[in-house]
Each structure stands twice: as C-alpha cells, then as structure tokens.
Amino acid sequence: MEGPIQTSYENGFFFFKIKYRSNYPFRAPILSFITKIYHPNISENGTISNCFKDWSPAVPTKAFIISIQSFLGTPFDDECLNTEAAKLYKENRNLYEDTVKEYVNKYANYSIYRNKLKEYEAEDIFKISEN
C-alpha cells in the first residue's frame, strides 16, 4: 500500500498482512504491518491497535484498505502501542514527522520496492516461459 499523500508517510510503500477470521465479515480482519513503521498505534512488531472497533460487515476490502491509509495520517489517543511515538506526536510534532520520514526512507522507500517488484515480475515471467 502506498503511504497517504500530504502526510509524512507519502512516498512510502508498506506491506501488511490481513488475516480474515472464521467469523468474517461479522468481525474485522486482523491487520499487521510487515514493513517497519513509526506510528503511535502500531507496535514495533507491526501489530495494529483496534482502530476498526466500529467494523461493519458491509465494509468491502477496498474500503478497509483506504481506511488504513487514512489511519496512518491521523493517529488516535486511546490505544497507543508505540509509547515513544505517541509521546513525540503529542509533545513535538515536528520531530515526530521527521522520525516518520526517516523510517519511510529507511524501511518503506518506494523506489526500492518498485525495483524489487519489477524483478519479481520478471522472474515470474521467466519461470512461466520455461514451462
């Protein structure tokens, strides 16, 4: 997923896992980030806080992913999993934004992932043509 524009996550490319529970769509899927990310509501291991407590079975997957993008740009106070990021967000927003950008450049650099995806696609095409 691309980072939301006009945020410090812009130009980042983030991988995450979506686990659909056995009682889906009546309960929200479980989401965890694979890409390292700096955010008050996301733990160091990628666990995301319960930002989907108002889940509705009518929510399609595309809307769910869009809500994740929106969530990145607007952290909330009630369930902070990264206390350092939460404290910085409240006390020094400029330093928080700079730290997010550092993480994006180091761990979610879009140009690096774009090149990796191109290599992967090329390898898949080559494997298919061998068969």
Regions found by a protein language model. Give the residues of each.
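Compact alpha/beta protein-protein interaction domains typified by the UBC
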Residues: M1-A86, E130
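Charge-rich (especially acidic), low-complexity segments
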Residues: P75-N131
